Amino acid sequence: MSGPNKIASKVSAVLQALLMMVVFVCVSYLVFFVFAFFKIDREIYKGAFNFSNCVATIIAMLIVNKANSTGKESFFKMKKLQPNQVVALLIIALGMLGMVTMYIYAADKIAEYLRSMQEAMEDYRESVDRFSETEQAVVPVWDSVLYVINLCFVVPFAEEMCFRGAVYGVLRKGFGPVLSVILSAVGFGILHGVNVHIGYAIACGLILAACYHLTDSLYASILLHMVFNVLGSGVASFMTIERFGIPSQITNRVMVNINLLTLFAMPFAVLAIAYLVNDRRSRIKKEAALAEAAAFAAVTAETEETVKAENKEDQEELE
């Protein structure tokens, strides 16, 4: 590919990636206007709002996948995960959550000495608190449960289909895997908000995109995201629903144990990533060897057919 064509390819990839992010934002605004039109309080029915937003995003991303797929090959890579890959991904998810735990702890320490950081941490905690602007008493319990279910299992599908499937996918058309991972992670971080979120969102985006690349499977990043959300927010959000009457002491103990587990898993997560890197290299070598063997077999078969044809001609001449 010539220089101008390379530049055009890169520019096109960036513009398409930005378009995918615009679609993501526009879907959210569309759901917002629908709720506003029907005068549904988004704060009281936040679970229903977030669920509707995610379902609409998934539908939009399925359309993107269909539009970009060629023949029987899906635009989103959806290889079946092997058991060894699943184990590695679970360890990575725990380590990723441990990294975020350390990030928040460090931010809290900085906030003790820096006023602006203190305000940022207050804003952050309000943004992740389901009931920061609404009393639990006015929220239907079904919506609180739907909020948790959506957070744990639907959000990962919607965000991974957008940022790893679509954004990373179009970036790969113009860039190598490393730069595509970085750019998609930056986009992921920016759309999570330019505050305390952005730092760990970019770091998590790097890990999620890298695991998608290493496994050639969107299931990998979805699994990572699910485990992260379940242990990072889902468990606490479920246990703090007042109508379930779970004592705060039990909730605190569970969350402390989860935090300790994730911190303990961090060094093993590094090893798990190294394992996936080695596993990908092994798969590439194996696929290359199989392709070479298939090519050799095809050449051998063609040679045998040629020899048979020549022998047949010689036999006919003798007759």
What annotation goes with each model-predicted range?
Residues 24-69:
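Alpha-helical transmembrane segments in multi-pass membrane proteins
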Residues 45, 74-155, 310, 314-319:
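Juxtamembrane helix-loop-helix connectors linking adjacent transmembrane helices
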